[in-house]
Amino acid sequence: MNLKVVYFGTPTFAATVLQDLLHHKIQITAVVTRVDKPQKRSAQLIPSPVKTIALTHGLPLLQPSKASDPQFIEELRAFNADVFIVVAYGAILRQIVLDIPRYGCYNLHAGLLPAYRGAAPIQRCIMEGATESGNTVIRMDAGMDTGDMANITRVPIGPDMTSGELADALASQGAEVLIKTLQQIESGQLQLVSQDAALATIAPKLSKEEGQVPWDKPAKEAYAHIRGVTPAPGAWTLFSFSEKAPKRLMIRKASLLAEAGRYGAPGTVVVTDRQELAIACSEGAICLHEVQVEGKGSTNSKSFLNGYPAKKLKIVFTLNN
């Protein structure tokens, strides 16, 4: 393949795709990623996963503070690229950038467009109980994930799959569908299909507060919520012990309690036959296998109950109206 490609991407998902493209000898002439960010607990700047891959392979690297910067745009033009590939870059590209490559800009979107347009298609589809996801390659336009579709691949969502696991599955097949698209571009056989705007839904970025588990919903829905926000932004609930001020409890691993039925009012603390912590929902309950009290390390729920006996434990949450 003779197409010259400039690759835009930032997180681990994009790094996996870039690594696979390089493995298949795609001609990556330059890489664009976001500027290094400081660690949460220190001022040390951390490179993006995509930057790490680019440096490992000795690829030309651009890290503009703004994608609209005139100098950056001139540097992009100098690469004389045939195609820009964009995978979770993390910033909006204006039309002046989209117009640079000979054959246009193509985005790998981790969702089945036109559903789940936006920053969090992986998390949102699991939270809403979807049983299938996939990758959609679109030719980018000025809208948010509104471009014409080039190719789609599909991935089933298992009943216990988390958003992290789905991201890994989608990333592992991302290069394949991009290579197919590049081959079609080079051969002149690419066929684009317009999105049906009537079927479009939005998947905005998740806030940390959206990680709170809705215990007042049926267990299946609450479990889908937990899976969707795992590992990020993270599932959590508030608990109080011996009537003290509530603390945040992060839920790292969970599962549906096998025995269906009612376990009391939503939020009721249940101790399973295996001496694990479970929480009642409006129907059924969810077993918590690994938890983390704010400010402490992760532990299994048996150890948690040793420190916080169930009789003095209360789950605090806001009802969803």
Swiss-Prot record:
InterPro entries noted in UniProt: Fmt, Formyl_trans_C, Formyl_transf_N, Formyl_transf_N_sf, Formyl_transferase-like_C_sf, GART_AS, Met-tRNA-FMT_C, Met-tRNA-FMT_N
Catalytic activity: L-methionyl-tRNA(fMet) + (6R)-10-formyltetrahydrofolate = N-formyl-L-methionyl-tRNA(fMet) + (6S)-5,6,7,8-tetrahydrofolate + H(+)
Origin: domain of life: Bacteria
Keywords tagged on the record: Protein biosynthesis, Transferase
EC number assigned by the record: 2.1.2.9
Binding site for (6S)-5,6,7,8-tetrahydrofolate: G111, L112, L113, P114
Gene3D superfamilies xrefs: 3.40.50.12230
Coiled coil: none
One GO location term (cellular component): cytosol
A GO MF term: methionyl-tRNA formyltransferase activity
Function field: Attaches a formyl group to the free amino group of methionyl-tRNA(fMet). The formyl group appears to play a dual role in the initiator identity of N-formylmethionyl-tRNA by promoting its recognition by IF2 and preventing the misappropriation of this tRNA by the elongation apparatus.
Family: Belongs to the Fmt family.
Name assigned to this protein: Methionyl-tRNA formyltransferase
